[in-house]
From Swiss-Prot:
It comes from the Bacteria. The active site is at 379 (nucleophile), 505, 507. Homotetramer. One of its GO terms (biological process) is 'de novo' CTP biosynthetic process. Pfam families: CTP_synth_N, GATase. One of its GO terms (molecular function) is metal ion binding. This is CTP synthase. Pathway: Pyrimidine metabolism; CTP biosynthesis via de novo pathway; CTP from UDP: step 2/2. Residues 294-532 form the Glutamine amidotransferase type-1 domain. The gene is pyrG. InterPro entries: Class_I_gatase-like (IPR029062), CTP_synthase (IPR004468), CTP_synthase_N (IPR017456), GATASE (IPR017926), GATase1_CTP_Synthase (IPR033828), P-loop_NTPase (IPR027417). CTPSs have evolved a hybrid strategy for distinguishing between UTP and CTP. The overlapping regions of the product feedback inhibitory and substrate sites recognize a common feature in both compounds, the triphosphate moiety. To differentiate isosteric substrate and product pyrimidine rings, an additional pocket far from the expected kinase/ligase catalytic site, specifically recognizes the cytosine and ribose portions of the product inhibitor. It is an enzyme of class 6 (ligase). One of its GO terms (cellular component) is cytosol.
Length: 534
């Protein structure tokens, strides 16, 4: 097996899921980058899907798309937002991918007639993919999805146990994230769930070096000492990760408890102070916001906010840029009431799939267009901008997307030519970064201030160029084009304060210290609109 020169931090979770392992891993990445180290982050997901691309957003949350077109776990979004890493398909490995690869090798005779088993064949495949993703990096942070004790996680935990033996304890660090419940009636923090979780991990053969404790409140020293004694770690290696109003405070909270120094000492690296100035500036901005804007998000998955994770963060980034708090007004597109939009400063129509809630989104777009409210359509949102305009301005009353009405006589949105006849849904959309050429003398050019941009995509349907002339005659222009195939990437309405749709997902490239230009402009114009009305 390939031997890596990288150091490895393995992050596991215990007690319950959704504790924030992804944010913790990303925050550790931010600390290490502050020390000038090159890093990568990887998520190992124990589910049997090859990727999350076909999973219901209510079950899995958002699908995050990388530059190279991988459909990945939303935690990769945290990794990219908190660090300078540009991740790829190597950075999200699922049990489905592992078993798929093992079975393909077995069919090709790669195992020379051996009985194929979880150990060593599946665990070897996991180790191989971990090592491949860590190439040429100082430190690889590897998050294992799920909770210790889950049957699905066992091959992954066994693989990282073996890796420590193979590459040496001096090159590996195990961090276990647990939950310490606060019983408010008794005013007491309970450590027993953490003790049992670590006991379970040790039974597998893994002794955590550091325990990060999630809790509603900060852990006092006596609680940390108790956890340290029962879990066989140093007291200073018990880190309190308490609830905060903004996740961007977490790198500073970890730094305050010397997590960076603990990691440096464990790996015998040069001892120096991390440069966290940009994080201090972000937190300072969030604590000194001058005003707020109300943005309506008209969506169909609003019961689970994780379905829009990158979008939420990108709006916050746009707010940070202008020292504004962004109040998100969640509007169910299936039960849209125009009263929900009366007092908002901007309307955002996010991406999505399927017919449910479409007409509500179209009504919201009509409201934003006719009332001259800053309105932003992303992916499906852009497509519905075209449908609404075709119906209510161009007079094509049955205008639609062939996704929702295959027999419409005015398919202003149609399936892409190369998507026709594709039967497999997984991994077959137009995915990843593509170039977009922006026309000068347009709002898009004013925002980007450059002709050529690269943005990430996830779609099968596109604007039908047969209708482009009709639209442009009436002031709805295509200001961004994919030059190789003349695909419409950005549309904007002239004689409107801010009515822009994009076929790509700008939220995937926004960072707290560098808001995406479209989100920054949208929030800025929403605030101008608010000031004009007050």
């Amino acid at each position: 097996m390939h031997v890596s020169n990288s150091k490895f931090i393995f992050v596991t979770g215990g007690v319950l899921s959704s504790l924030g392992k992804g944010v913790a891993s990303a925050s550790i990445g931010a600390l290490l980058e502050g020390l000038g180290l090159s890093i990568t982050l990887q998520k190992l997901d124990p589910y049997l899907n090859v990727d999350p691309g076909t999973m219901n957003p209510y079950q899995h949350g958002e699908v995050f798309v990388t530059e190279d077109g991988a459909e990945t776990d939303l935690d990769l979004g945290h990794y990219e937002r908190f660090t300078n890493t540009n991740l790829s398909k190597l950075n999200n490995i699922t049990a489905g991918k592992i078993y798929n690869s093992v079975l393909e090798k077995e069919r090709k005779g790669a195992y020379l007639g051996s009985t194929v088993q979880v150990i060593p064949h599946v665990t070897d495949e996991i180790k191989s993919m971990i090592l491949k993703a860590s190439k040429d990096k100082d430190i690889a942070i590897v998050e294992i999805g799920g909770t210790v004790g889950d049957i699905e996680s066992l091959p992954f935990l066994e693989a990282i146990r073996q890796l420590q033996l193979e590459i040496g304890k001096e090159n590996t660090l195990f961090i276990h994230l647990t939950y310490v419940p606060y019983i408010s009636v008794a005013g007491e923090l309970k450590t027993k769930p953490t003790q049992h979780s670590v006991k379970e991990l040790r039974a597998i053969g893994i002794q955590p070096d550091i325990i990060i404790c999630r809790s509603e409140v900060e852990l006092p020293q006596d609680v940390k000492s108790k956890i340290a004694m029962f879990c066989n770690v140093k007291p200073e290696n018990v880190i309190s990760a308490y609830d905060v109003d903004y996740i961007y405070k977490i790198p500073l909270i970890l730094k305050a408890q010397n997590l960076d120094k603990i990691i440096i000492d464990a790996f015998r690296l040069e001892n120096k102070e991390p440069n966290l100035t940009k994080w201090e500036n972000i937190v300072s901005s969030l604590e000194h916001l001058k005003d707020s804007v109300d943005i309506a998000i008209v969506g169909k998955y609003i019961k689970l906010k994780d379905a829009y994770k990158s979008l939420i963060e990108a709006l916050i980034h746009g707010g940070i840029e202008h020292k504004l708090k962004v109040n998100m007004i969640w509007v169910d597109s299936e039960n849209l009431n125009e009263k929900d939009l009366e007092h908002v400063d901007g309307i955002l129509i996010p991406g999505g799939f399927g017919e449910r809630g479409i007409e509500g989104k179209i009504r919201a777009l009509n409201y934003g267009r006719t009332k001259n409210i800053p309105t932003f359509g992303i992916c499906l949102g852009m497509q519905l901008m075209a449908v609404e305009f075709a119906r209510n301005v161009l007079g094509f009353k049955d205008a639609n997307s062939t996704e929702f009405d295959p027999n419409t006589s005015n398919p202003v949105i149609d399936i892409m030519e190369e998507q026709k006849g594709i039967e497999n849904l997984g991994g077959t959309m137009r995915l990843g970064a593509y170039e977009c050429l922006i026309k000068e003398n347009t709002k898009a050019y004013e925002i980007y201030k450059e002709n050529l941009i690269y943005e990430r995509h996830r779609h099968r349907y596109e604007f039908n160029n047969k209708y482009k002339e009709h639209f442009e005659k009436h002031g709805f222009i295509a200001s961004g084009i994919y030059p190789k195939k003349s695909l419409v990437e950005i549309i904007e309405l002239q004689n409107h304060r801010w009515y822009i749709g994009c076929q790509f997902h700008p939220e995937f490239k926004s960072k707290p210290f560098k808001a995406h230009k479209l989100f920054a402009s949208f929030i800025e114009n929403a605030y101008i609109y608010k000031k004009e009305r007050s």
